[in-house]
Amino acid sequence: LIILNVIDPFMLKIGIVGMGTMGRGIAQVAAMSGCEVLVFDAQSSMLERSKEELVANLKSLTEKGKISQAESEAVQNRYHWCHQL
């Protein structure tokens, strides 16, 4: 897993509408790169599924030694789950 640590200073916060496969992936890469990520999906069930998948992905990366527990928590804290636009 390669995460770029070069962040455009004008893109420290991004919003993702739609937490399907692509939305979840984009959100995770952005959060792991240091961006604050606001995520929204019209279906609450998709937000819950996304949270569960994020936790599972970060747990796997931590267990494999790719990231530390502190990094995992920092990534999770960069997510802002939005239930309305």
Place the predicted regions along the sequence by residue.
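Intrinsic disorder/low-complexity segments
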Residues: 1-7
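NAD(P)+-binding Rossmann beta1-loop-alpha1 motif at the extreme N-terminus of oxidoreductases
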Residues: 7-60, 64, 80
